[in-house]
Regions:
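Short, conserved loop/helix-junction motifs that constitute active-site signature segments
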Residues: 68-72, 97-98
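Short beta-strand/loop motif that positions the catalytic acidic residue
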Residues: 71, 77-79, 83
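Acidic, amphipathic alpha-helical patches
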Residues: 64-68, 91
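Flexible "cap/lid" loop of the alpha/beta hydrolase fold
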Residues: 1-10, 15
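Conserved alpha/beta-hydrolase "acid-adjacent" motif
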Residues: 84-90
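Hydrophobic, aromatic-rich cap/lid helix
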Residues: 38-65
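Catalytic active-site module of serine/aspartate enzymes centered on a nucleophile-bearing elbow/loop
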Residues: 100-148
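Hydrophobic "lid"/C-terminal helical patch
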Residues: 18, 54, 94, 121, ...
Length: 148
C-alpha cells in the first residue's frame, strides 16, 4: 500500500502512485501537465508522518461515526462520484448522521475534486457559506428584534 511505498521508496514514489487514486481518469489526463504540485506537496512531509496518518485513518472505529450525531453546526459534506478512497456511500452516511449536514456530489470528480474541479468546488463552497452567513444574520436580527 501507500504506507509501504512511502517507507520503502520515499514520498515521491508514493505521490506518483497516489495520483491515479486521487484524480479521476479523465481529469488525470487533462491535469497531467500540472502535476508538478503533487511531488513537492508530498515531499513536504516525512514518510513517518504519512504512515502515521494512514494508520490513524485505518484505526477509526464506529464510535467516531456515532459522535457525528452530536455535530449540530451547518456542515457541507462534499464527495466526487468517482472517489474510490472515500466513496459516495461513506459521505452519505456522514451527512445522514449529522443533523444539519448538506451533501453535495461532484459529478466526474475523484478524491482530489478541489483541484480537478476547482471552479465547481469554489462555487459550491461559496454558495454554502453565503447561505450560512445569511441564516446567521437573520437569526441575530430576530434575537435583536425580540430584545427590543
Amino acid at each position: 500500500g501507500w504506507a509501504t511505498t512511502a517507507t520503502e521508496q520515499g514520498m515521491g514514489a508514493m505521490a506518483r502512485e497516489a495520483a491515479r487514486w486521487v484524480i479521476g481518469p479523465r481529469s488525470f489526463r487533462r491535469l497531467l501537465p500540472a502535476f508538478g504540485w503533487l511531488g513537492p506537496l508530498a515531499m513536504g512531509r516525512t514518510s513517518h508522518a504519512f504512515v502515521a496518518q494512514v494508520k490513524a485513518i485505518l484505526e477509526v472505529d464506529e464510535s467516531v461515526a456515532e459522535q457525528l450525531e452530536q455535530v449540530h453546526i451547518p456542515t457541507l459534506v462534499l464527495v466526487g462520484n468517482q472517489d474510490i478512497l472515500t466513496p459516495r456511500g461513506d459521505s452519505e452516511e456522514i451527512a445522514d448522521r449529522m443533523p444539519n449536514a448538506e451533501l453535495v456530489v461532484i459529478s466526474g470528480a475523484a478524491h482530489g475534486f478541489m483541484v480537478e474541479h476547482a471552479t465547481t468546488f469554489n462555487r459550491v463552497l461559496l454558495e454554502f457559506l453565503g447561505r450560512i452567513t445569511k441564516a446567521q444574520r437573520a437569526a441575530v436580527a430576530d434575537v435583536d428584534a425580540k430584545a427590543s
